[in-house]
Amino acid sequence: MSFEFTIIVPVYNEEDNLERVEKELLAYSKIATKNTCILFVNDGSKDKSQAIIEAICERNNNFNYISFESNKGLSAAIKAGFDYASTALVGYIDSDLQTNPEDFNLLLEHIGEFDLVTGVRANRKDSFVKNMSSKIANGIRRSFTHDGMDDTGCPLKVIKADFAKRIPMFKGLHRFLPAMILLQEGKVIQIPVRHYPRIAGQAKFGLWNRLLGPLSDCFAYLWMKRKYINYKVAKHDL
């Protein structure tokens, strides 16, 4: 089977969630509007995640993995997924499954016209502190990037791979994916998706990661925006 769409699943110490991830993504792949494969990126997990991932990939032909030597963070895991994917479309979902894989089909409806389609979590099922810190962080980021996105941290996105592979990722830049597509003169849109409470495992981001960390990342983004090279080839004979 020729795959058209790769779902990247970053994993860090998610042993309690992975069998549910397998079940949900396997079910989604049967109803997906594009031929879909799954790529786990094990971000240096210290629990049994790697052994579980290998077992999942052994019994499913459309599941593969890469595994880091040590923990490098979510941005690195997403970047590695972009680099290793061989399909025309890439997307990602968190391994906590607080978003529904079936909603990828909602995003795929728009990927022909847009270069990045991101979910925006409707009726978020997180704590008051987490919701408020995310809203404040999104407001700060939006004032820097002017990307018009309300929920750039939503872990459900679809991107054309030729755009994704040109993103010069740095730590924290996963929050700026729509803005980085706009720097390439691409088109972005946000679509409401479902959101659920975390069932197992522990959240990897605290108040610092959600609020204070992104503020410093905004200045890194502004530096990159000034230095970013975006060229278009008019002609070639390659």
Can you name each region flagged by the protein language model?
Residues 45, 70, 125, 129, ...:
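Residue-level signature of the cytosolic catalytic core of signaling kinases
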